Regions:
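Long, internal low-complexity/basic segments
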Residues: 3, 8-16, 21-70, 77, ...
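Active-site His/acidic residue clusters
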Residues: 82, 284-332, 370-372, 376-380
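Active-site segment of extracytoplasmic enzymes that catalyze sulfate/phosphate-ester chemistry
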Residues: 82-189, 194, 223-226
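Short, solvent-exposed turn/loop segments enriched in Gly/Ser/Thr/Pro and often Arg
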Residues: 89-92, 111-133, 141-148, 204-217, ...
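A short beta-strand-to-alpha-helix junction
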Residues: 92-99, 114-121, 147, 151, ...
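Histidine-centered active-site microenvironments of extracellular/periplasmic hydrolases
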Residues: 214-222, 309-315, 324, 348-405, ...
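C-terminal cap/loop subdomain of S1 sulfatases and analogous C-terminal strand-loop tails that border
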Residues: 225, 229-235, 369-391, 406-410, ...
Length: 557
């Protein structure tokens, strides 16, 4: 090749590279937005669906059912608002979508009328449930967030029509540890580990969100088997069996759709695709696992992804709700319908296998419903949302049953939290609590038994950085740094938090601030920092116009 031709070829190549670089730069936000999904496709290719090789217990029982420790099933929904469930006085009943299966647990057992999540966000709440401890005792204070999100968050959250911007600390984000390393320390003792010491076979199905390294996965936290939700699609977006609803006004939704995938793994093996709509798939596998373990005591943690975004309903459920004219509400109601159907199928499997009489079933949600799906009544009558410390973010559906031990139709008025699940089921199973650490939850069984004692007064706490809450003897204090404000409510008189008494009750304000200071003194720093603070309007959904004077708080992640 002549020098002239070589120069010409190099020039063409350079121009082509420059054009590609210019194209990438011009579409850099698109590239960044889709990068996590592309990386997932390369790092974790999904294989075709295959049967889950659930372990099989004894062919015959070693003890009569009544002599065995009770089976224990904890079903946790994701982002399910208290007004989504008809036993709590809400539900989509006007639209023909009650929740009869969830309601039946309350009918046959107890409804907790002041049932609280351990946090207003998923990871922290799940850590509380697993350990019976306030998660900030061991540094879990924020939901793990990939540092790469900060690079696109500025664009995602940029909206000139919004008065209240998100606050992003790019310096902290640039120093963020690898996303997979963020989670609950393996040194924590989980409810599964306690039950394993009593001979339980422990099964995890669904969402975990407490870390994905080997040491933090369920199999290293006391679970014998784990069907692990690896990403976040209920079905592929174009699958004819699914109906989608996208919220273009929601930055989180715009991030999820290009980056979520449809995949699970079994016992930390290779990713593979489920066989159907995710809620139904997890339910199928839960029923199979119950059948395989009917002759030995088992603990099952069925952690549904429903009804978390992205909003995707099975087409069958969507078609069954043709009476709902609004597309988004119809998709959401169909998702609620699928979660309730799952509960019903699990209960039926227990009856079919003759296990119902000696199985504890608990149903709850990890936090209240979010504002960012644009449906205004999901937490009614309570104010606030997921990512707030108002009642709408913390008060959740919470029902339980244990035939013969918890009287049917019990309505329990005292405050309870999902930190109480570990000590309660440990007591039922005869397991001892750890003595080398503080357990914040309490065993509820003495208070639920026929003629049981009254629950002693106690304080409950929540925390997200400097945004903190204490509830004590019917009073609740919320303190915030952004905005710098205190809210003081008498929940006995004002359960929906309409009247801020902070300026009218200085002595009570000081008393509760002292409780907060005492509780948080000496707590360790978070294991990882937050680098995004998101504004959440207390009384508006994300798609509603913001106005001067709107009441809001900021949530750190």
């Amino acid at each position: 090749m002549s020098k002239m031709k070589l120069r010409k070829s190099l020039l063409i190549a350079a121009l082509a590279l420059a054009a590609v670089a210019a194209l990438v730069y011009a579409n850099r936000m698109y590239v960044l937005m889709y990068s996590l999904g592309w990386y997932t496709d390369i790092a974790n290719p999904r294989e075709a669906n295959r049967p889950v090789p659930w372990q099989t217990g004894p062919a015959a029982p070693e003890q009569a059912l009544a002599q065995r420790p009770p089976n224990i099933i904890v079903i946790m929904a994701d982002d399910l608002g208290i007004n989504d469930v008809s036993t709590h006085g809400g539900g989509h009943q006007a639209e023909g979508v009650p929740t009869p299966a969830i309601d039946s647990i309350a009918r046959d057992g107890v409804r907790f009328d002041q049932g609280y999540a351990g946090s207003a966000v998923c990871t922290v709440s799940r850590a509380a449930l697993m350990t019976g401890r306030y998660p900030w005792r061991f540094g879990v204070e924020f939901t793990p967030t990939p540092g790469s999100l900060a690079r696109v968050a500025g664009s995602l959250y940029a909206d000139p029509n919004r008065l209240y911007p998100a606050i992003i600390d790019q310096a902290k984000a640039s120093q963020a540890r690898d996303f997979s390393d963020l989670g609950m320390p393996a040194s924590e003792r989980t409810v599964a580990e306690l039950l394993k010491g009593r001979g339980y076979h422990n099964i995890h199905i669904g969402k975990w969100h407490l870390g994905s390294t080997a040491e933090m996965r369920p199999n290293n936290q006391g679970f014998d088997e784990s069907l692990f939700m690896e990403s976040g699609l209920y079905l592929p977006e174009k699958d004819p069996r699914v109906v989608n609803s996208k919220q273009d006004f929601d930055p989180i939704d715009r991030f999820l759709w290009p980056n979520m995938r449809y995949g699970v793994s079994y016992n930390a093996g290779k990713w593979f695709e489920p066989s159907k709509y995710l809620t139904d798939y997890f339910t199928d596998e839960a029923v199979t696992a119950i059948q395989r373990n009917k002759h030995r005591p088992f603990f099952m943690y069925l952690a549904h992804w429903g009804v978390h975004t992205p909003l995707q309903a099975s087409k069958a459920d969507y078609d069954a709700l043709a009476n709902i004219p609004d597309h988004r509400r119809r998709v959401y109601a169909a998702m609620v319908r699928s979660v309730d159907r799952s509960v019903g199928r699990v209960l039926q499997a227990l009856r079919d296998e003759g296990l119902d009489s000696n199985t504890i079933v608990i149903f709850t949600s990890d936090n209240g419903a979010p504002s960012y799906i644009g449906l205004p009544d999901l937490n009614k009558p309570y104010r606030g949302w997921k990512l707030t410390l108002f009642e709408g973010g913390l008060r959740v559906p919470y029902v339980a049953k244990w035939p013969g031990r918890i009287p049917a139709g019990t309505q329990y008025a005292a405050p309870v939290s999902n930190i109480d699940i570990l000590p309660t089921v440990a007591a039922a199973a005869g397991a001892s609590l750890p003595t080398d650490r503080v357990i914040d939850g309490v065993n509820l069984l003495p208070f639920l038994a026929p003629g049981g004692t009254a629950q002693p007064a106690r304080s409950l706490y929540w925390r997200d950085g400097p945004y903190r809450t204490v509830q004590d003897q019917g009073w609740k204090l919320i303190v915030s740094e952004r905005p710098k404000k205190d809210w003081l409510f008498n929940l006995g008189d004002d359960p929906t938090e309409q009247h801020n008494l902070a300026s009218l009750q200085p002595q009570k304000l000081a008393q509760l601030k002292a409780l907060l200071a005492t509780h948080h003194a000496g707590m360790p720093p978070p294991l990882w920092p937050s680098f995004i603070e998101m504004p959440v309007l207390i009384d508006k959904t994300l798609d509603q116009p913001q106005a001067a004077g709107d009441e809001l708080t900021y949530w750190a992640n």
